[in-house]
Amino acid sequence: MHDLNMIAGVQVKYADRQKFSNTGYGYQYNEGGKVTVDYRIMKMMIESNFDYYGMGTTRDRFAAFYFNADYGFDSRYIFSGTVRYDGTNALGSNRSARWLPTWNVSAKWNISNEHFMESTEWIDQLSLRGSYGLTASMNSSASASAKFVNENTKRPYGNEIESVITLEALENSELTWEKGHVLNLGIDIGLFNRRLDVIFDYWRRNSFDLIASLKNSAIGGTLYKYANYADMESRGYDLAIGITPIRTKDWNWKSNLTLGYTTTKITNSKNMPSIYNMINASGGNREGYPVGSLFSIQYKGLEHDTGVPLFINESGVIANSVYFQSTNLDYLKYEGPIDPEYTGGWSNTFRWKDLSLNVFLTFQAGNKIRLAPAFKTSYSELDAMSSVFFDRWMQPGDEKYTNVPSIVDVLTADGFKSKYPYNSYNYSTERVAKGDFIRLKTISLTYKVPKHYLQRTKVLSDVSLTVAGSNLWLIYADKKLNGQDPEFYNTGGVAQPLSRQFTIALNIGF
């Protein structure tokens, strides 16, 4: 039996957006929205050249032509192919930059539908899948056009302020799509009357012409410019296993395990990151390493007399200071990616008659986290001190037993004002934790009222009561986090633990 489907089409989208913003003063939230303005705040804003009003316009245009064909034979062999031709005004003005043809081919072999599998009753499903193609995406934050903005000159007196047009971004007429060749191979298995289901996918992507803001010589008037500056390789796999060990009229137990692995490597990069770009909490991009790699300044102990930390600086010398703007990264230590390499979850559902219990765990591993900065050269009575200071250096000889630096006196602190050793300590190998965790995500208990009871009412068709709790227990996390949550963090470090939530739900169907 042959099955052939074809479709062709055109897609056109446009969007015109206008943005207005203004700052209002004197709005009293606690007094019903009454406005009370002190004229001195307006005077200060005008004299400070503060723009309290702004507006902007954007015009997006997008067009695509596509064709897709699917062919299947006897539900055993399935082939598919797609061709697209996309264009947008968000990219460079050159035609070769704005317009791009992409394609994809895929095939599937349903082995379980073959005639030689008819006698194999314990195999319910067995199929192989594969696809390969060229894909493309558009970086929504990038713009190829020159950007001019209207600003006021910075003048001390109001009658001297003038309106000027400032160049904010340079044009890049050759800015084009981010592209990638993607290979995907998969297998689907169902065994023993679907008591065991396995889905496995392996994928590999070679990305090129990736877009980012690239530092340049500033000859054109701006220091940064959007450009296609990098190539990257990424690969991984996704595994899903479903098992039903018990399946009877009154008893049922179903278990589902999911596991994903992803790794990346930048194979070509035109950027020149500084030390700070690579050691901050959000990670940096460096050729030969994963996207979002976290590096650290190498910590080399504490000074015997002062307890001030020592490091290997940008020149390879052990010293108190490190120049964060240096582009020599040879002496940094690679910690790992900030994004987890392994992610997954494990769900178990137990049912006895009309009562069911679900337990869901999540986990991740393979990433590193920069701990939030906690050390300064000097402190005051207003500073909140971390408990880590209980283990700080306090007298000569303590450097043999602790890696926590001292709180120095005023004279010693004055000598380090231009060196910032404590800031370097915040970004050293001592201030890194593993992002691995295992979490009891949810537990829910549901009771469904039996159908024969509901039939007596002649009104209700379904009634169930559910009691659930989420974020109940962080089973494992790195002790260096001191209770902070490794799953949710940003450029400022890690977030506080998620709050536990409990819900009761009553569902009634008529």
What are these regions (language model features)?
Residues M1-Y289, Y427-F510:
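Extracellular/periplasmic, surface-exposed regions of secreted and cell-surface proteins
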Residues A15, F20-T23, Q28, A227-A230, ...:
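Conserved small-residue
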Residues S80, S321-Q325, Y420-P421:
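Short, positively charged
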Residues T88, Q364-S464, N482:
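Extracytoplasmic gating/loop element in the C-terminal half of outer-membrane beta-barrel translocons
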Residues L167-E168, L329, P340-E341, Y425:
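Flexible glycine/proline-enriched surface loops and loop-helix/loop-strand junctions
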Residues N256, D330, P340-D354, K441-T446, ...:
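Conserved SET/PR-domain catalytic core that frames the SAM/AdoMet-binding pocket
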Residues E335-A372:
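Glycine-rich, aromatic-lined ligand/substrate-binding cores of catalytic
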